[in-house]
Regions:
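Conserved glycine-rich phosphate/nucleotide-binding loop
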Residues: 136, 144, 149-155
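Acidic, His/Gly-enriched loop-helix segments that form or flank divalent-metal centers
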Residues: 3-126, 130-135, 151
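Short acidic-glycine loop/turn motifs at beta-strand connectors
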Residues: 43-44, 141-146
Length: 155
């Protein structure tokens, strides 16, 4: 790409087009802030990642240094119901709207016990409700596993 202001302006307009209705709010400062975000967040009880985590033959997470950014961001295999990590941490993920898996815009949970009481009782939680088109956001309480939904009123 050329290093001219016109090229940068065109690129910013292309990025803004991903956010119809409020794309003009996206500026270079925000793009720079996004670039500084981590590709995943790992805590004692859970991992948050955009698309999922590649697993080895025993269902264990591959080591982070063996995973490409493309796998974390684009790989859709983790959404499959039969892909269950053999780990103690719950994985929060999205990338593929849940309506493409179960024909409804609801959080999909994969419990490891029959009566889950908190986030440690889940293998994985599929959070992507296709908010761009469904205008619905789903949240899950990490302490209880209770689900909450907010639907934007259609105009």
């Amino acid at each position: 790409m050329k290093d001219s202001p016109d090229d940068y302006g065109k690129l910013l307009r292309q990025l803004q087009a991903w956010f119809p209705g409020d794309g003009e709010l996206l500026d270079w400062d925000m793009v720079d802030a996004f670039e500084g975000l981590p590709w995943y967040i790992e805590r004692e009880e859970f991992v948050c990642v955009h698309a999922g985590i590649p697993l080895d033959g025993e269902g264990k997470f591959l080591p982070w240094d063996e995973i490409s950014i493309e796998q974390l961001v684009h790989d859709r295999r983790f959404k499959d119901p039969d892909v269950l990590p053999n780990e103690r941490k719950c994985v929060f993920f999205g990338h593929t709207p849940t309506s493409g898996v179960r024909n409804e815009e609801k959080i999909i949970t994969y419990p490891r016990v029959s009566n889950p009481k908190n986030i440690s009782d889940f293998y994985k939680v599929h959070l992507d409700l296709g908010t761009m088109t469904s205008e619905m956001v789903g949240c899950i309480c990490m302490d209880t596993g209770e689900e909450f939904y907010v639907q934007r009123e259609l105009r």
